Amino acid sequence: MKKFIKLSLISLGIISAIIFIPFLILMFSYDQHADDYYKTPDEFLNSKSFSWYIDIFPKSSRNIFLRTFVETNGMIVIFEANKADEIPLSQLYPITSKGIDYLSDFNIPASQKQPFLDNGKLYCYFYSNNSPYLVSKYYSNNPDLVHYMFTSLRSEEALGLCPSNTVKTH
C-alpha cells in the first residue's frame, strides 16, 4: 500500500510538471509590451495611447517610438525635435551617476538606446502631476536636431536616480 501511495504521488508530480512547465514557459516568453510608431505629436494625441501617457512632445517632434509595458503601465518614448524647440533645461534636473546603469537595462533594442548611452546626458523630469521620468537627451550630427528618450519611473526608482530635493514621495 505504501508503494502504491508513493508511486501515485510521483506520478502526480510528473503529470503536474508536464502540465505546468509549458504553461510557465509560455507565460514568461510572451512579450508584455506594445510598440507604437507615430510621425507627429498630433498623430500621437489622436491615438489610443494618449489617454494613458503624457503629452511631452515639443511641436516639432517627429519619429516618435512608444513602448508601453502592459504589466507595469510604464513607458519608454523616443523622439526627435528641432533644437530651437527643445525642452528648457530649467525643467530638467541632473541625475545621479546610477542613471547609465539604469538606461543600459532598458527593455528596448540596443540600436535604439545605444546613441543615448554613447552621447546622451541624463536628467529627471517631473510632469505636471509630479510623475517622474528619466530623460536622456543628445544632439545628432545634424546641428538642428535634438533626440530624447523619456522613461517613466516608479517612486522608488526616482528616489535612487533623481536629486532628493526634487522627488515627491506620496
Outline where the language-model segments fall.
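N-terminal Sec-pathway targeting helices
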Residues: 1-21
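Alpha-helix initiation/capping motif
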Residues: 2, 69, 82, 140-142, ...
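Context-gated lysine
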Residues: 2-6, 39, 48, 59, ...
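Residue-identity detector for threonine
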Residues: 5, 40, 68, 72, ...
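N-terminal export/targeting and maturation segments
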Residues: 21-95
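Extracytoplasmic electrostatic interaction patches
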Residues: 91-170
